[in-house]
């Protein structure tokens, strides 16, 4: 079947191609972050930055820019459709990546990174809205989890990609090659993706209407607790991401093996997404994610005890962080699915404002966690525990004090639209 508003000459996507395409759009953003990790020290030194923690800003500025930029694409996509917003984001991403490759000072790089992140935030927002256009309930959670599984190939490989480019061509070519990949993805989307927004769900661009839609998405009790909880959990991971090169490569002494350790941890996260995609329709998004949150808190408490004991080894740290990343994967797609479920008619605006709220919270707190790096794993471990406990309180708020409820019994989830995905 064709989607609403689809072009007859464009053949429908199969489910596998649809999932890989959505993952590829999100992966461009991840590539702009994770491929930079091995090059942070070199970039900072070559562009004249002297404070060792300032190198983290190459990552932190991008995360924050993506968070701020997430507020607008949903409203535009609810009016004009998903495709125009995607192509605008892809164009900005490509041009700014090329500009970053040509900078001559650290401040200019940070400014361009911020602008690139602001303008390309639709690459993160639109896949969630497109999936919501097509599916609901646990089926939507499975699709998001499967997309996240494919997407996780990039964080696994990106640091090694970045290190290889750094060694053979220099850090500027990392930006250049991300631009080339963006052009390739743009061509694919142009040729294969039909518009998924139902014309009946188009929203007018009126500030009052946009504000009402966004207010609706943020005032729903069943949703907002999950949005904020997700932001708190991911703040810990962003804190790790910001300081990972210093923490793993320098403090724990991984050195040139840092990309391998990072790939191993990210690979565990990918496997967790695979597990989630297989079990979520059987057990339900709430049961899976609530169990993961409780395990996250328990493991964070163990991390705190090991960090303050002062004898934590690289292997112990890597194993515990890999486990935490697995648990985050079991929460991520499920929290997103639960928080988007009430908003079928305003999926774009809801996805945008939720992504904005979640990302601003996680990027600001993650930046603060990264900047608090003191040569030990203590700040990170403490932040993971505090974030997990606060997230539990917020989930309990959204669930009226009851965990593990199953609202969509197995077999009752169904697609709500068919955008040519089958």
Q: Regions from the language model: what does each represent?
A:
Residues 39-68:
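Extracellular/periplasmic helix-loop-helix junction of adjacent transmembrane segments
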Residues 5-12, 194-226:
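Juxtamembrane intracellular "pre-TM" segments in multi-pass secondary transporters
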Residues 67-107:
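Conserved MFS/SLC helix-loop-helix module at the cytosolic interface between two early adjacent transmembrane helices
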């Amino acid at each position: 079947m064709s989607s609403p508003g689809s072009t007859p000459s464009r053949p429908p996507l199969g489910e596998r191609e649809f999932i890989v395409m959505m993952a590829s759009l999100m992966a461009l953003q991840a590539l702009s972050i994770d491929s930079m990790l091995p090059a942070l020290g070199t970039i900072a030194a070559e562009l004249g930055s002297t404070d060792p923690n300032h190198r983290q800003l190459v990552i932190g500025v991008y995360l924050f820019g993506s968070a701020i930029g997430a507020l607008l694409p949903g409203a535009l996509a609810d009016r004009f459709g998903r495709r125009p917003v995607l192509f605008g984001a892809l164009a900005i991403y490509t041009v700014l990546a090329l500009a970053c490759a040509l900078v001559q000072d650290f401040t200019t790089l940070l400014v361009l990174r911020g602008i690139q992140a602001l303008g390309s935030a639709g690459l993160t927002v639109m896949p969630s809205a497109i999936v919501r256009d097509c599916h609901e309930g646990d089926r939507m959670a499975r699709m998001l989890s499967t997309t996240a599984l494919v997407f996780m190939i990039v964080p696994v490989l990106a640091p090694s990609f970045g290190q290889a480019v750094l060694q053979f061509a220099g850090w500027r070519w990392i930006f250049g090659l991300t631009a080339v990949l963006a052009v390739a993805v743009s061509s694919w989307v142009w040729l294969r993706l039909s518009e998924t927004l139902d014309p009946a769900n188009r929203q007018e661009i009126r500030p009052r209407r946009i504000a009402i839609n966004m207010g609706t998405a943020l005032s729903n009790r069943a949703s907002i607790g999950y949005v904020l909880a997700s932001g708190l959990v991911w703040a810990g991971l962003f804190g790790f991401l910001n300081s990972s090169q210093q923490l793993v490569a320098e403090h724990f002494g991984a050195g040139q093996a840092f990309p391998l350790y990072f790939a191993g941890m990210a690979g565990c996260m990918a496997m967790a997404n695979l597990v989630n995609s297989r079990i979520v329709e059987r057990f339900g998004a709430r049961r899976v994610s609530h169990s993961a949150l409780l395990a996250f808190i328990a493991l964070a408490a163990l991390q705190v005890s090991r960090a303050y004991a002062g004898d934590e080894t690289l292997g112990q740290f890597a194993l515990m962080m890999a486990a935490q990343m697995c648990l985050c994967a079991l929460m991520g797609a499920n929290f997103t699915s639960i928080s988007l479920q009430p908003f079928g008619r305003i999926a774009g605006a809801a996805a945008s404002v939720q992504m904005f709220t979640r990302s601003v919270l996680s990027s600001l707190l993650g930046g603060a966690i990264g900047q608090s790096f003191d040569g030990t794993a203590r700040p990170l471990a403490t932040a993971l525990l505090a974030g997990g406990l606060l997230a539990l309180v917020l989930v309990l708020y959204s669930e009226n004090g009851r965990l593990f409820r199953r609202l969509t019994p197995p077999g009752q989830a169904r697609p709500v639209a068919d955008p040519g995905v089958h």
